[in-house]
Design a protein with these regions (language model features):
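N-terminal phosphate-binding or glycine-rich loops at protein starts, especially the Walker A/P-loop
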Residues: 1-23
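A short helix->loop->beta-strand "cap" motif at the edges of active sites that frequently abuts
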Residues: 23, 106-110
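Short internal beta-strands
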Residues: 24-33, 114
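Glycine-rich oxoanion-binding loops at beta->alpha junctions
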Residues: 41, 45-76, 88
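Conserved anion/nucleotide-ligand pocket segment
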Residues: 133-204
Length: 234
């Protein structure tokens, strides 16, 4: 499972790196925003083939599929998870990872999580999710701003019994602590193009439960808001 943020040095994507070094990459599972990270939030993305490598891309966000088919699970031995999260309960990448972990537990497949820093990992804030409201934008009883990395979520979910126990290995980030400032070298999704957007997203995004637009699709997402019936400005 990977995205454009899954780059080894900010320029080389993991799939390109593994493929170039002779690893047998049998498939790519793509989450929300698609393999190249260009699809908008909630947009359904069809399965396809990566033009650069010829590797099949199996979409987990096509409107029908939330977990891979049995055939897809039989096509590999080890699942490598490399997705750049931003530390929000409603940011869906960790949910895709948990679903894949459950599928791997059922199929006897190993999971390797290549951990990455959390750009919002220096603090925790917001209410803990009441699990009667569990959904595709909230899957664990954690705060809105949870402060965890993907690897920490994976380990905690297994340890707390929130996810099925699987053969899990987390490759940690060298020299990273939660006090380490971190700015993303690559945008993890179309509407988080800047560090400012990443910082504003946890609080401002909550207003998307209303009819107000928060600037998605502009060059200042989450920095502006508007509605056709609004007059003047603040």
């Amino acid at each position: 499972v990977r995205l454009p943020g899954a780059a080894s040095d900010g320029t080389i994507h993991l799939v390109d790196l593994l493929h170039g070094r002779g690893f047998d990459v049998t498939g790519i599972f793509s989450p929300e925003h698609g393999f190249r990270g260009t699809a908008d939030a909630g947009e359904h993305v069809a399965s396809s083939v990566d033009a650069a490598t010829g590797i099949p891309i199996r979409s987990l966000y096509d409107g029908n599929t939330k977990r891979p088919s049995d055939e897809a699970m039989r096509s590999f031995d080890v699942l490598v998870v490399d997705m750049q999260d931003v530390g929000l309960r409603f940011y869906t990448y960790y949910i895709t990872m948990l679903r894949m972990m459950d599928a791997c537990a059922e199929s006897g497949r190993s999971v390797i999580v290549l951990d990455r820093p959390n750009p919002n990992g220096h603090h925790v804030d917001g209410p803990v999710l009441d699990m009667k409201y569990k959904s595709g934008v909230g899957a664990l009883p954690i705060p809105v701003l949870h402060g965890l990395t993907m690897g920490e979520i994976a380990r905690m979910a297994v340890g707390e019994g929130w996810a099925a126990s699987c053969d899990l290995q987390v490759v940690r980030c060298r020299n990273y602590t939660h006090d380490t400032p971190y700015e993303l070298p690559v945008a993890p999704s179309p509407n988080l193009p800047t560090q400012r957007a990443v910082y504003l997203y946890p609080s401002v995004c909550l207003f998307e439960g209303t009819v107000v637009s928060l600037g998605r699709g502009t060059d200042k997402p989450f920095e502006v808001y508007g509605h056709p019936d609004m007059t003047g400005c603040l």
